[in-house]
Amino acid sequence: MASEIVVDHREKALALLKRDADKILKLIQVQMDNLTMPQCPLYEEVLDTQMFGLSREIDFAVRLGLVDEEEGKELLYRLERELSALHDAFTKK
């Protein structure tokens, strides 16, 4: 029974982190769809704040043992790749 609860907490923690990562991904995709200048100070501030917040959430979940460190790193890496693609798309515009 206790192991089922731990697994449930881990699944919930990972699902919440993925949901937060998806919100950031949507911000990036909106910018890509519109090719809005990624150097906009407001855009950068919002995205930086969101990415920092997610990294802290992931760190907390890892420290609690709810999320594997590699899973957390992969979530951030995926967002960083998308952000890099946005910058590449804008510079080729």
Curated annotation (Swiss-Prot):
Pfam families referenced in this protein's UniProt entry, alphabetically: DUF1507
Protein name: UPF0358 protein BLi01701/BL02974
Disulfide feature: none
Similarity comment: Belongs to the UPF0358 family.
Record-linked NCBIfam families: PRK13666.1
Species of the source: Bacillus licheniformis (strain ATCC 14580 / DSM 13 / JCM 2505 / CCUG 7422 / NBRC 12200 / NCIMB 9375 / NCTC 10341 / NRRL NRS-1264 / Gibson 46)
HAMAP family: UPF0358 (MF_01560)
InterPro entries per the UniProt record, alphabetical: UPF0358, UPF0358_sf
Family annotation (Gene3D superfamilies): SO2669-like
